[in-house]
Amino acid sequence: MQILNGSNEAKSPSSISLGISNSYAINPINTNRLYIQSSMSFKSLPGRNNYQYYPDIGFGYKVSKNLALEGSVFNHSFGSFSDQTIRGGVQYYFGSSDTLSWVSSLKKVSYKSVKNFNLNNITIELSKWIKYRQNFFRFGLGSNFYTKDNFLFKQKGQVNFILLSTIIPVSFFQLSFETRMNLDMFFYSFSLLKDFH
């Protein structure tokens, strides 16, 4: 489940764009092919009591050693609001012949807040995976390009960010902590991941 936590600032197009584009941690180093991820990302806003949520559960599948697909369809109701998120993307792994530790990804997310607005988002990322003992670390850069349509006018923009994450094996699943940030926003993500052969 992916959740963006906030109020007025969280409802801005740039903030929503960054909140709904959480990356799927499909590990390029191990050989497992199917991934299921449940995550919660949020932005902390001191002094605010109102929260807006954006849930998501998604999957990833390695088509080959250096190519993976990701996607999800999630509908969620909160009070009198009903929201739908549809996402799909591709990840390409590259690096040395024996270790594909670099990842470039392209993802499109369509967020529909019924009776309020639609937001279409394209995310481009470049990241590096590093293994230390049993843990994995990932860092990279990315950009979101969004279009918000509130049925009266359209608003376009771009959000650039830095990505840092840690993936820790716990029993039969993995726990991930991720940060996406720029000079204006700071998002946290907590994820549970399960991979299969």
State where each predicted segment sits:
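Glycine- and aromatic-enriched membrane insertion/assembly motifs of diderm outer-membrane
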Residues: 43-100
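Flexible, solvent-exposed coil segments and beta strand-coil junctions
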Residues: 64-69, 103-108, 168-173
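Outer-membrane beta-barrel transmembrane domain signature
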Residues: 1-51, 109-184, 193-197
